[in-house]
């Protein structure tokens, strides 16, 4: 296998331990090849990758300045402890609130140099989207403010969890248990829709699962590209710019990929939920991620709009030896898993 094909195969294995075992087996004693593949993977992680971040999450040319906050920095009553996330326009920190109560929180702040009118509007829209919702499976907004230099921030509930797909695989959860978690996620998204908010970027890394008294609890996070339907999220109505792709391609609905300027509605989130369910059941997304990674921008759009996804029950037969691992993560074997997925789940996912 070429280094490129090894790299693409490794990207499809989210669990670090399983990815390392795959690389050990495929690279063998070729230490130089392993080092080059590891560097490719590290560069991909550092860049985020088009499939791993929202397509609209780009940095305006010439506006970026280095992040000035470091562990120990005080922003209002919040002491920053460590960076836990970063997007195109914002950075998320784990922080400790010191007054009037002491607790751990997540603090999201606009990057230096990114405080343009459009970015601030998007940032404020995310804060307002979270503020209007009150659901146990959606991260809560606790506070908001601005730094001395005027950069806005908001404070959220700290969700110490892992992406829903990783949680299910690590715990070898059978399909029935995965469906229970998925239904809970659907209830959370339904609540957002009832409040007039479309998420627009539903994917595993935006659905984190944590344990409460030994019970897995999913939390929907990151409404950074959310859109209002029946209420205004900011004082100025936000429109998606014509020709701007909003969402993450592997989970994106055809109407999002179209970029025609036409409004999308709650059905777009429902489509993305279907992709998430497909991945929970089969371990893969409906459109082969390798095809998306090697495709150009126009081809990505065409694949999302036109590609015919195989039914979940037949997808396993195309995965070769990987099907045994995926089925094992679901507490069964490939034949039984295919039988389980045939029927209603084939049509729902």
Locate predicted features.
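Eukaryotic low-complexity, mixed-charge intrinsically disordered interaction/regulatory segments enriched
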Residues: 1-26
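N-terminal alpha-helical segment
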Residues: 2-3, 18-19, 103-106, 345
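Conserved ATP-binding/catalytic core of the eukaryotic-like protein kinase fold
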Residues: 11, 64-326, 341
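Short, hydrophobic secondary-structure boundary micro-motifs
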Residues: 19-21, 35-36, 49-53, 288-290, ...
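Structured, non-catalytic alpha/beta "coupling" segments that mediate domain-domain communication
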Residues: 32-58
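Short hinge/gating elements
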Residues: 326-335
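Conserved C-terminal C-lobe helix
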Residues: 340-349
